[in-house]
Amino acid sequence: HLNSVMNDKEIRAQYEKSLNLLTSHYGKIGQNKKLFSQYEKLYEQNRKNLTQSQNKLLENVLRGFRLSGVHLNVKKRKLFRECQEKLAKLESKFEQNILDSSNSWAKNFKTIENLKGMPQSSLEIAEETAAKRNEVGYTLTLDQPCYMAVMTFADSQSLRKTMYLAYASRASNKFPISCKWDNTKIIENILLLRQEMSQILGYKNYAEYSLATKMAKSTNEVIDFLESLKIKAISKSKKEMSVLKNFAKKHYNLKTISPWDIAYIAEKYKEENFGISQEE
C-alpha cells in the first residue's frame, strides 16, 4: 500500500528487495514437507474433536501447502518456486507501469473556464496540485479522485474524453505520453507463467487452479453463472441506457452517449429526477 501512495525511488527499491525476500520465504514455507506433515498429523489426530471452523482452518492450511507444490519432487518444487518468484516480479512491474504512466500525465488550466461543473472540493485539490508542481491555476491528474470528479461533474465533454482516453490507455501502447510503460508483453508472460505453474501442479489451466480456493466446482459452472448474469445484466443495462439516451438528447442535445458521457449524464439524471448528488 505504501509503495502505491508514497512511491519514490527509495521506497520502490526497498519494496522490490522485500518482495523478493518474502516471495522466496513464503515459497519455501509452502513447500516445507516437515511442516506440512505436522499440520497433517494435527488434523488427522484431532479432527473428530475440533469444531467445524477449526477443521476448516486446518483444511485450508493443508490445501495451501498442496497449492504451493509440497507434494512435488525436488526438481518440480524448484521449478515452481522459480515461477512464483518470476511471477511476483512481473506483477510488481505491471503495477509500477500503471503507476508510472498515471503519474506522467497531467493537464493544467490557467483559469476555471474549462472546469465548469466541477465540485469546489475537487477544484481546491486541483489548485493544490498545481501549486505543488509550480504551476498557475488548476492541474488535473489521473489519480482516482480527480479522474472520477471530472468524469462525473465536468461539463466539458472534450475534457471528459481526454481524461477517459488517457486513463483507459494507461500502461499500453496507446497511452498519449509514452508507450515505454506498455504492459502488453508483461501480461503475456504472466499468463504463460500462470499456465506453467498450474500444469506443474496437475491442473489443465490457471482457471482450474484458481477454483481450488473458491466455491465453484468447475470452470463450466463459472461460465454458466457468468452467461446467466450477462443475460440479466444486458437486459437491465439496455433499459437504463435507453433512459439516459433520451435524457441526454432532451437536455443536452446528445444524439449518442459515449463512454466518457455515461457517468456525467447519469449524475445529471439523478439530480434532475431524484434530487441527489454524488458529491453530497
Where are the model-predicted features located?
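Membrane-interfacial loop-to-helix junctions in multi-pass inner-membrane proteins
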Residues: 9-19, 182, 225-228, 249
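N-terminal helix-rich structural modules
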Residues: 1-118
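Second-shell loop/turn segments in exported
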Residues: 66, 148-150, 176-180, 211-222
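Active-site-adjacent "gating/activation" loops or surface patches in catalytic cores
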Residues: 132-171, 262, 266
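Acidic, low-complexity proline/glycine-rich segments
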Residues: 44-60, 141-162, 194, 199
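A conserved hydrophobic secondary-structure block that centers on an alpha-helix together
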Residues: 69-83, 170-192, 196-209
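Short, charged, low-complexity loops and linkers
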Residues: 40-45, 140-147, 168-185
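Active-site-proximal, well-structured secondary-structure segments within enzyme catalytic domains
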Residues: 53, 57-59, 86-89, 96, ...
